[in-house]
Swiss-Prot record:
Protein family (similarity comment): Belongs to the RuvC family.
Cofactor(s) required for function per UniProt: Mg(2+)
Residue positions binding Mg(2+) 1: 8, 140
InterPro entries named among the record's database cross-references: RNaseH-like_sf, RNaseH_sf, X-over_junc_endoDNase_Mg_BS, X-over_junc_endoDNase_RuvC
GO cellular component terms, semicolon-separated: cytoplasm; Holliday junction resolvase complex
Recorded name of the encoding gene: ruvC
PANTHER family: CROSSOVER JUNCTION ENDODEOXYRIBONUCLEASE RUVC (PTHR30194:SF3)
Entry function: The RuvA-RuvB-RuvC complex processes Holliday junction (HJ) DNA during genetic recombination and DNA repair. Endonuclease that resolves HJ intermediates. Cleaves cruciform DNA by making single-stranded nicks across the HJ at symmetrical positions within the homologous arms, yielding a 5'-phosphate and a 3'-hydroxyl group; requires a central core of homology in the junction. The consensus cleavage sequence is 5'-(A/T)TT(C/G)-3'. Cleavage occurs on the 3'-side of the TT dinucleotide at the point of strand exchange.
Active site: 8, 68, 140
Name assigned to this protein: Crossover junction endodeoxyribonuclease RuvC
Catalytic activity, reaction form: Endonucleolytic cleavage at a junction such as a reciprocal single-stranded crossover between two homologous DNA duplexes (Holliday junction)
Length: 168
């Protein structure tokens, strides 16, 4: 059995999900959303995300992490802020010594639903089917669990994994 963490980056809401994988069997362990206060400075919000992710990693002890790649939208400022949050999502597990994989949204959707053009509702529905009993309250948590499920399906491919190195 291996424990995996999926992360859906976001500066306002960062989704996270922990699953256990035993062969083809997937089990929901925990999931949720880390929220930050939009009135706070960006550096403070990034520190909050880092601290919360570090606490979750130490509490649930996943062996590997996976992060969804971000997309570029028309608003350059929003894209840049999302990139900052993604940096925290990549750095924190790597700093804690976890291998970190990255997957595009279409790959995640195709792995979970069977089509890269699936809606958020379809992804949530399939996550609930694949993880019976999981109570998912926010789309960001569902997306993070979908990233973890995608990683469970693709983790044998070393091309997606960047080795983490424990620094402290």
């Amino acid at each position: 059995m291996i424990r995996l963490m999926g992360i859906d980056p976001g500066l306002r809401f960062m989704g996270w999900g922990i699953i256990d994988v035993d062969g083809n069997h997937l089990k929901h362990v925990a999931s949720g959303v880390i929220g930050t206060d939009g009135s706070e400075s960006v550096p403070l919000r990034l520190c909050e995300l880092h601290g919360a992710l570090k606490k979750l990693i130490r509490e649930y002890a996943p062996a590997e992490a996976a992060v969804e790649e971000t997309y570029v939208n028309r608003n350059g400022s929003s894209t840049l802020k999302l990139g900052y949050a993604r940096g925290v999502a990549l750095l924190t597990p790597a700093y804690e010594g976890l291998p970190v994989a990255e997957y595009g949204a279409m790959t995640v959707k195709k792995s979970v639903v069977g089509t890269g053009s699936a809606s958020k509702e379809q992804v949530t529905m399939m996550v609930k089917r694949l993880l019976p009993g999981a109570e998912i309250r926010k789309a960001d948590a569902s997306d993070a669990l979908a990233v973890a499920i995608c990683h469970a399906h693709h983790r044998a491919s070393a091309a997606h994994v960047v080795a983490g190195k424990r620094m402290a």
